[in-house]
Amino acid sequence: MKLQLMEIDAQTACVPARGKLDFLDLGFVNHCLLDIRLIGVRSCCPGGFSSYVLERNGRARGLGISLGPESGGECFLLEKRLRLRYEFISANIANYQLGPALFESSFLQPLPEGFNDGAFDLCLLDAVPIWQEQKSKGWDGQRLFLSQFILALKGVKRGGTIVIRLSRPELLYTARILWILDRVSQELRTCKPLTIHAKRPSFYAVAVGVGLGVEASRLPAIVDQFQRLWVELTFGGEEGEGRWLEDVDFDFLISQDDLIDTFADRLIDLSRSVWVVQTQTLCRLVSASKKQPTREMWRRTSSVLTCNNVSDAILYQTIS
């Protein structure tokens, strides 16, 4: 994980080497289960990303949130010599009250004392679910993503940076996240580290100057809408145990038609480096297997040519 952030930083300069730096690391909060009414959740504690930031910047101070061993999680992995500048909170982020201010539930806890709105210069979001078949629900991964995104939007300082792991930029779901980050930030860049992610659909978006973009005035309302959606994903559905994210749920950001009309070219610019890395990696894998790739094969295997969820227009521009 340390090598991944090193690659990202080398391309985007997202981790300053000097000056005061307060950061939030949810990158190792890997919950296999987000149903807050069940127990036995495992997680991997903050380590690699935090270690890189603390070593790079001697004035950096961090906050990491994850389950500890007493709750079924893993041991705290950060080097002991760095822990004086780091606060670790043993908790499940899905147990926090991430809905609107007036929403109440006996299942939820207030945000920890170490977390304050607008407190962090840098927010690192790399959480992915580790599934347990008998307990996890299909939408738990979507709830996990939304939970960490809400924490980042609330926690980042005006002018701060968000580094977030996403998947397949051509998907409507992902494209809308890229759109809002692009609109509320001064600069948005994408990066696909060769470490681990080269042949996977995952990549990272780095939003610099969050709160200084052309749509920055919308941020409070956007956070409120995400919080309302979080309640729906957590307690909605026919049985009141949550539901899947639907395409229309992000319409409050931008409609699909407007996204295509106004963001297609920008989306392709942001996605090109991601697609190039993955395509080159897949080419090497195919060459190593001594098989000749066909166009139809790339349609099935490469995210470069499987963007059928945004629009035919974006697909056409991407292939052309």
Language-model segment annotations:
Residues Q4-P16, I196-S320:
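C-terminal lobe and adjacent flexible extensions of AdoMet/dcAdoMet transferase-like proteins
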Residues D25-H31, G40-G47, L67:
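Class I SAM-dependent methyltransferase "Motif I" SAM/SAH-binding loop
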Residues R42-S43, G114-Q134:
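Conserved proline-anchored active-site loop of SAM-dependent methyltransferases
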Residues A60-G68, S90:
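Conserved SAM-binding motif I beta-strand of class I
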Residues L67, S71-G73, S136-G141, I177, ...:
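Class I S-adenosyl-L-methionine-dependent methyltransferase catalytic core
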Residues K135-R189:
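Conserved Class I SAM-dependent methyltransferase catalytic core
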